[in-house]
Amino acid sequence: MVKSRPLPSIFEFNKLLSAIAKMKKFDLVISLGEKMQRLGISHNLYTYNILINCFCRRSQISLALALLGKMMKLGYEPSIVTLSSLLNGYCHGKRISDAVALVDQMVEMGYRPDTITFTTLIHGLFLHNKASEAVALVDRMVQRGCQPNLVTYGVVVNGLCKRGDIDLAFNLLNKMEAAKIEADVVIFNTIIDSLCKYRHVDDALNLFKEMETKGIRPNVVTYSSLISCLCSYGRWSDASQLLSDMIEKKINPNLVTFNALIDAFVKEGKFVEAEKLHDDMIKRSIDPDIFTYNSLINGFCMHDRLDKAKQMFEFMVSKDCFPDLDTYNTLIKGFCKSKRVEDGTELFREMSHRGLVGDTVTYTTLIQGLFHDGDCDNAQKVFKQMVSDGVPPDIMTYSILLDGLCNNGKLEKALEVFDYMQKSEIKLDIYIYTTMIEGMCKAGKVDDGWDLFCSLSLKGVKPNVVTYNTMISGLCSKRLLQEAYALLKKMKEDGPLPDSGTYNTLIRAHLRDGDKAASAELIREMRSCRFVGDASTIGLVANMLHDGRLDKSFLDMLS
């Protein structure tokens, strides 16, 4: 254009700038505007409006204001379009007070703010969490003779629903009806979706029926919101009925609709229904996405159908839907829980080959699986790899590591890790301390366990019932029954209250020590607390009864 002779008119340049601005290439518009000036092509009001709008869209308000000043010096008066662009810039640029002031200035300057102006300001007020001012502005619009339109009400309904002010959104529907403005499917969808998010499923269904009564045709968004909500409540038949209903009305379900149903069905173990939906998706040429496959794989893993989960994993890869970290984490967890740790390890290696780096969950899951499998050496190797790969262990990782080391007779190694944790900035919780106390007691180092237990109050950590039971069990293993009983007394006085495990541990210890009277007293106390003998206690009493060391009254007391 700039090489044409004669030069095209400013109107032609403005058409070009406007078209580029609509494509949201604001930097290019600004650059072209500067080039026009260098070539001596003067801007007119329309050009300035386009450029000011572009600066505002780029959140460069100061440059927009500078251009406004230049334009006014050249004798151009800003139009309602100019000021609306600035208003939009203020609203999106965290300058809401300037936006409100600008509207007041517009009135003082003799401009009459229109529906677009007010709607822009209302949207800005909601963006800045000023809902009451936004709602009040709707009434002010009417007072100033500017009737809110469907877009205005849509903005207000959306803002209220995002805040959870659903009652106010309903009031607005009534206002619209009084003003003879018919709410459209978008407004109904907004309220229905909000009702679903805040778990008012029956209200959402009632509103759905109301919109149909008013002749407003629901769309795929309406159905998807309701189906997803019904699924989260386990109302499968209602969700399936809605799916049938939308298909009957020639409203094609989309990926969101199918994903909601599939995710819900697999979590409930309804795999036949989930797989039928998956097949139906493919028949309708809707490509399942990573969420679809992850839902199916997660459901299969949750219900211990690992071979089916692996099949689905291989199928998704064959369809060029590549597994993500969630996919691998789900499968690794499933295999480790089912004691198929080798399969989990193989997937872990495959991840690396695909260029995926495991996260804290990946490593922690695999470490736990290896420890449960008795593979202490490889569990430690994976932990070392985790640290060398720069993946930060969390408190759960350390808890699993310490527990695994202690349970596999590696107390010294556990103590090294524990010592490192104490010296670092890791905030240790009661579960970590309980694990170490148990590890010490199991290794016969009850005195060390006792010292650590006694230090908890100095560390500002309150022992829970498991901590007490662990320490009582350790003391009982060394036949330190008086000390164990003293802990029971402390629990009753200071909390936490003893549970079934506390009493059963002490009862067995006194029985093994031959103190029938103390055992009988503990049984009576336990029963008064509505606890009963566990399998280990009943088994011990039965054996002692068989050997003639106890009479039947003990068994009767426990039953």
UniProtKB/Swiss-Prot annotation:
Query: Membrane: present as a keyword of the record?
Result: no
The chain's coiled-coil residues are none
The record ties this protein, via InterPro entries, to:
Pentatricopeptide_rpt, TPR-like_helical_dom_sf
Query: Gene3D superfamilies in the record, alphabetically?
Result: Tetratricopeptide repeat domain
Assigned keywords, A-Z: Repeat
Placement of PPR repeats on the sequence: 9-43, 44-78, 79-113, 114-148, 149-183, 184-218, 219-253, 254-288, 289-323, 324-358, 359-393, 394-428, 429-463, 464-498, 499-533
Q: Which family does it belong to?
A: Belongs to the PPR family. P subfamily.
> Mind telling me which NCBIfam families this protein's record contains?
PPR (TIGR00756)
Q: What is this protein called?
A: Pentatricopeptide repeat-containing protein At1g63330
* Organism encoding this protein: Arabidopsis thaliana
